[in-house]
């Protein structure tokens, strides 16, 4: 963790801003705007890009991926520019929580993978890029989105240490644990060999 140097109110404001940005459910907004139905009643019921892909609309899935990752990145960049590095890491955490527990959806949100990657790209782009490449490599080999997410999340702390961003390791560990918790049902299906592959409805 970075040294806490910013004032309490500055940290509170950037934390709240991060949460509000993170809680925007772009998957639901996009699928409703395109007349694709209620995403919570499609496929896995998750509000993220992988489930949007199950509607068969690839542009909608891509837009969801970019916006879900972008909201985390924007929260970090605003906090860093306006306050400092301590606020940036706080905004990364609260934007991630916002995606997982959005107030607009009764605190029932997504699994946070895209937002996780977006915050890492903004906090330290080499770490974010390494995690994105880890996701892509795992997806190419296994064709299972949830497995790719778990491997990318687990590798985050390792990449932080190897690439010289050890001050982010505590944040990375917390985010990884939350991702694993949100994927508990996926983990059971992976172990049982019943987890759907990418592109399957």
From Swiss-Prot:
Keywords: Cell inner membrane, Cell membrane, Lipid biosynthesis, Lipid metabolism, Membrane, Phospholipid biosynthesis, Phospholipid metabolism, Transferase, Transmembrane, Transmembrane helix
EC nos: 2.3.1.275
Membrane topology: Multi-pass membrane protein
Membrane-spanning intervals of the chain: 10-30, 59-79, 87-107, 116-136, 161-181
NCBIfam families named among the record's database cross-references: glycerol-3-phosphate 1-O-acyltransferase PlsY (TIGR00023)
One GO biological process term: phospholipid biosynthetic process
UniProt protein name: Glycerol-3-phosphate acyltransferase
Broad enzyme group: transferase
Keyword Nucleotide-binding: no
Species annotation: Cereibacter sphaeroides (strain ATCC 17023 / DSM 158 / JCM 6121 / CCUG 31486 / LMG 2827 / NBRC 12203 / NCIMB 8253 / ATH 2.4.1.)
Pfam families in alphabetical order: G3P_acyltransf
Gene: plsY
Pathway(s) annotated for this protein in UniProt: Lipid metabolism; phospholipid metabolism
